[in-house]
From Swiss-Prot:
InterPro entries per UniProt: Pept_tRNA_hydro, Pept_tRNA_hydro_CS, Pept_tRNA_hydro_sf
Family according to the record: Belongs to the PTH family.
GO MF entries: peptidyl-tRNA hydrolase activity; tRNA binding
Xref: Pfam families: Pept_tRNA_hydro
Catalytic reactions on record: an N-acyl-L-alpha-aminoacyl-tRNA + H2O = an N-acyl-L-amino acid + a tRNA + H(+)
Enzymatic class: hydrolase
Protein name in the entry: Peptidyl-tRNA hydrolase
Gene Ontology cellular component list: cytoplasm
Natural source organism: Solidesulfovibrio magneticus (strain ATCC 700980 / DSM 13731 / RS-1) (Desulfovibrio magneticus)
An individual GO BP term: rescue of stalled ribosome
Subunit structure: Monomer.
Length: 211
């Protein structure tokens, strides 16, 4: 079965960053892999031995009649600012186009508890997206934007590398499975249907601490 798309979770490697806001994409990708296991499309390691990425293939029942399609799920291990190199390597290996890439990433311009789905567009200051755009030579990949909120009067670079606060954790736990539902909806029903599903989700976040 040929891989039909590459799903990329953005984040930084290593336990130090595992629970940080910048690793929201990794969190959702992990949940997608668990969903695949539950549905009978267990992930299998691929592209083994590489130092720039981790990758698995998995199957999801998103075709008519509940038939399975195969996807590659990729975590860049290059650190955020060089994510595009890993995505380019996976794209070349599977001989797919930039339009076959689906990226999961944290989004400062949305509050925690909200998501948006789109194809193409700018990078909104996100260095991972900037790197992917540069390496692929095209912005026409799909992005699932996972809101983390923008802090007032604080350094953004430090904020994204902090772990979610304890009072934010219940919201994160709601967002992650809803994001997986959105991914499934995209591959099952297309962009517009998935946009409505993702855009209609709203988990109320706690207020941001004042500086």
């Amino acid at each position: 079965m040929a891989v039909s798309a590459i799903i990329v979770g953005l984040g930084n490697p290593g336990p130090r960053y595992a629970a940080t806001r910048h690793n929201f994409g990794f969190m959702v990708l992990d949940a997608l892999m668990e969903r695949a296991r539950q549905l009978g499309g267990a992930p299998k390691a691929t592209l083994t031995g590489r130092k720039d990425l981790e990758a698995v293939t998995l199957s999801l029942p998103v075709l008519p009649g509940g038939a399975f399609a195969q996807f590659a799920c990729v975590k860049p291990l290059t650190f955020m600012n060089l994510s595009g190199r890993a995505v380019r390597a996976a794209l070349d290996f599977y001989k797919l186009a930039p339009t076959d890439v689906f990226v999961l990433h944290d989004e400062l311009d949305l509050p925690l508890g909200r998501m948006r789905l789109k194809r193409g567009g700018g990078n909104a200051g996100h260095n991972g997206l900037k790197s992917i755009n540069q390496e692929l030579g095209s912005p026409e990949f799909v992005r699932l934007r996972l809101g983390i909120g923008r802090p007032e009067g604080r350094d953004v670079a430090g904020y994204v590398l902090e772990a979610f606060r304890g009072d934010e954790t219940p919201v994160v736990r709601q967002v992650v499975p809803a994001a997986v539902d959105g991914i499934m909806a995209f591959f099952e029903d297309g962009l517009e249907t998935a946009q409505r599903r993702v855009g209609g989700f709203d988990a109320v976040p706690p207020p941001l601490p004042q500086p």
